A protein has these predicted regions:
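Extreme N-terminal segment that seeds HTH/winged-HTH DNA-binding domains in transcriptional regulators
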Residues: 1-37, 43, 89-130
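Beta-hairpin "wing" of winged helix-turn-helix
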Residues: 31-36, 61-73, 77-81
Length: 130
C-alpha cells in the first residue's frame, strides 16, 4: 500500500506529527480501509527520507489512539473502526482543534461574534462538499 503523505521539514509541526495527522485523516475519511496493511516502518522512512524512529513514533501514536494495530512480525494494520466511531473520532478532533483556536482568538481580544463570523465566512468560501 502506498500512503499519500506530504511532509515538510520547514513546518513547525514535527515530522512524526505530520505523518500521524495525515494517516489519521486518511483512515477517518475511509481512504484506507480497516485491516489494510501499512507500509513497513523502514519502507515509509526510506520513501520519505525520515528516520525510522520518526515513523515508529507516528505509528505508535496512531496505535494508542486505536486507529492502528500491530501484529508481531507482520507490521501495522488499520484497525477495524465502525462508521459511527470514525465520525465520533473526527468530531472530537475537530472540537479539540477549534477549542484551541477559539481560546487563542479570545486571548487576542476577539469577541465570540467575530469568531463565529470568521468561521461562517470560511465555511461559505470553502463551499459545500456534503
Amino acid at each position: 500500500m502506498e500512503l499519500l503523505l506530504h511532509l515538510s521539514e520547514l513546518s513547525a509541526e514535527p515530522l512524526h506529527a505530520q505523518i500521524s495527522r495525515q494517516i489519521r485523516a486518511q483512515i477517518l475519511a475511509e481512504r484506507i480501509a480497516g485491516d489494510d496493511p501499512l507500509p513497513s516502518i523502514r519502507a515509509l522512512a526510506r520513501e520519505h527520507r525520515v528516520s525510522v524512529i520518526t515513523v515508529q513514533r507516528a505509528y505508535e501514536d496512531l496505535e494508542r489512539e486505536g486507529l492502528l494495530r500491530s501484529r508481531l512480525g507482520k507490521g501495522f494494520f488499520v484497525a477495524e473502526i465502525p462508521g459511527g466511531a470514525r465520525r465520533e473520532m473526527a468530531v472530537r478532533r475537530l472540537e479539540e482543534a477549534l477549542g484551541r483556536l477559539v481560546a487563542a482568538a479570545e486571548a487576542e481580544g476577539l469577541a465570540r461574534a467575530e469568531i463565529r463570523a470568521v468561521f461562517e465566512r470560511l465555511l461559505r468560501a470553502k463551499g459545500s462538499t456534503r
